[in-house]
Amino acid sequence: KVNGIVGHMDCKINGEVVDVKSASKFAFNKFQNGTLAADDPFGYLGQLAGYEEAEGTDEGGFLVINKESGELCMYTPDDLDKPNINTKINTLLDELKLDKPPELCYTPIPDGKKGNMKLPKGCSWCKYKHECHKDANDGAGLRTFKYSTGYTYLTEVVAEPKVDEVL
């Protein structure tokens, strides 16, 4: 428990917190190559930092299995790659008390080469995405398109996608 937030770690190995993850090949490579800090849409580093704070440790890591190949890796992030979890939790708790949404967590990213802009993954699963981006597409809000790989939320449509729009 950290600042009133409860979590459940997976295990400790040699006295250090270890979070066990199964990952796609793409996500597995972020752990294996040590590039998770550059793109951590699920907040894994914050999760680890929270477990470490609660346990009084600071050299934890992730034991990750590639779901496609069964390959394993152990990734121990640098301290500077982990957020100050007390500050992060306090900031989020303060933002939850606001009458209006906080600043956007993520900025839209290009979708292909024709000028369309979409929400990044970290924003796509958020239940507030429509509220945060209600002014997208010249005030019409987010436009949702169904691709074979799932839904894409466009903030700016320059070229109409050749897939079904979810209305």
Predicted regions located by residue number:
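Short, mixed charged/polar active-site loops
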Residues: 4-6, 15-17, 70-74
